[in-house]
Amino acid sequence: MNLGLSVAALAGVALAIAAASVAPARRGNGENLMIGNPACGKNPGNAGHGTPLVTTGKNQLAIFAQGCFWGVEERLRKVPGVIATAVGYAGGQAANPSYEEVSRGSTGHAEAVLVEFDPAKVSYAQLLRFFWETHDPTSGNAQGPDRGTQYRSAIFTFGAEQQKEAAASREEAQKGLRDPITTEIAPAGPFWIAEAYHQQWDERHGSLSCPLPHRARRN
């Protein structure tokens, strides 16, 4: 399956998608995952999108934050039924944040992965199980050696049904863990696509850069 990102396209295009127009969902290209917002950011390679984020056709969206987004994205791209991915920044206050700003912890954003998936091939519940099993949701603002609010565990949901499923899955996951889960569950706000050099980092560099998964202590 080819989920390659056109880095040059993401870096060189200033995004301004009309709210009424739907771009086709090209594999691996975060530019075309969603309906844009007229007020979306226009910095090349750091293009912001406002809510709502909407896919074309029957596909659905999910946003997961579970530490350094390089390794998280690489693992998600290997899940059958995942159509496209983009790494970016979610859950913060500032508009159009840069990686440097997010890394300083000054914007409130978490490093996150936006996923487009085909629910006929992989359910949201299955993606949630993958989420709980591939990081430590009890470690607060950290994953392994990475420290800071940008590395916190979070699920950003689209609609009441995802919110309900995410909350139920958190309760179920807690039953098997010794320490309390710190994962934030919140409605998806603006998702800001990260700079082009972050997209599909591990795939382009031929290695798994982030030391994931980190396992929580089990009962």
Where are these regions (language model features)?
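Flexible coil/turn and secondary-structure edge motifs
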Residues: 2-219
